[in-house]
Amino acid sequence: MMNSKQTLFSLLMCVLALTSCDTQKQATVGNELALTRAKQTLDSLYLNYSVSGTCLLRENYPSNIGEYTATYLASEEQKNMPNLYSYLWPYSGTFSAVNALFATTGDKEYKSVLDNKVLVGLEEYFDTRRTPEAYASYINSAPQSDRFYDDNVWLGIDFTDTYMLTKEPKYLQKAQLIWNFIESGTDDNLGGGIYWCEQRKESKNTCSNAPGSVFALKLFEATKDSAYFVKGQRLYEWTQTNLQDSTDYLYFDNINLNGKVDKAKFAYNSGQMMQSASLLYQFTGQEKYLTDAQNIAKGCHNYFFQDYTPENGKPFKLLKKGDVWFIAVMLRGFIELYQADKNGTYLDSFSKSLDYAWGHARDEKGLFNTDFSGKTQDNRRWLLTQAAMVEM
């Protein structure tokens, strides 16, 4: 007789056998305009952010290197250091962007861009001086920089997606190497969970744990190793227990080691929990996960969109001004949920917002502001914003 773990594994294998590996590919029929816009935006990105003689990119346009301070780092010293090149996080957005174009079109041109441009530049951040090996927040030729678990999780997801598209083992090997680093950032404090930064283990953040769950579940799909499923499920449950707002089903930002919760709400955190719940529903068929995902989706639609009426136009739901890459990651959750319930309401809101942004938030160089209404302009255009627009 099979034990419970064997039974679960057998059921999961049946689900995977019935689930096409092509679910991450979006149908191109009817999306020609969106695809053309994505290609144009990628061209604008490389035209305006490339650094001659390298595969690296600037962080902003215009660059104004001495005037820019990255606000998303842990180290004050590193924050105030002028950098010629983008930090890892904004650079990594190009991986997701090119992956999305490759997945959508199947065009080997994007596989070439990935292998010969994106991943060549990415390896400039790969740190082999510390163990486990992982990607650092800045290039290796500079002084040693912090390593973030969330930065690496996003890359692990991308490498796994590329493996699922190509079945080339080198991508899966890199994803599994990254997973080893992620696991090194877990312990029993607060009952589990992944820290945010390797050098400053002071908090466990939704931005590490929610995508950590997605990453593990994708690795399960790629390898059929049920250990990844168990880890992904546990990360989902830990994050839900410790960081969900029970009033609207959205997710808070982090919990420190004293148990104090930072109650800021960002689109990507809730979006990744929506995606994880949708994957868990896909793999188990348990309705509670579908309900979880649908509750988060409703909360996100209410919180991150606004009622907007353009001049001489019909009212619609427009994405609020904010971090555009956070919005792109939230969209991943809505896409995954759509695979389960076929409710197109939320994707329609995204489509209308992106269409409006094309006409109102895009400048003469083909770069986007963060205010999709077009009422305010950014002083500089962030690399990660442009990559996010390509992905969406």
Where are these regions (language model features)?
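Bacterial N-terminal signal peptides that target proteins for export
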Residues: 1-9
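Bacterial lipoprotein signal-peptidase II cleavage site
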Residues: 22-27
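Well-ordered alpha-helical scaffold segments within catalytic/enzyme domains
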Residues: 92-108, 154-168, 211-225, 272-286, ...
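Active-site cradle of extracellular carbohydrate-active enzymes
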Residues: 207-212, 216-219, 228-280
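Oxyanion-binding "anion nests"
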Residues: 269-284, 289-305
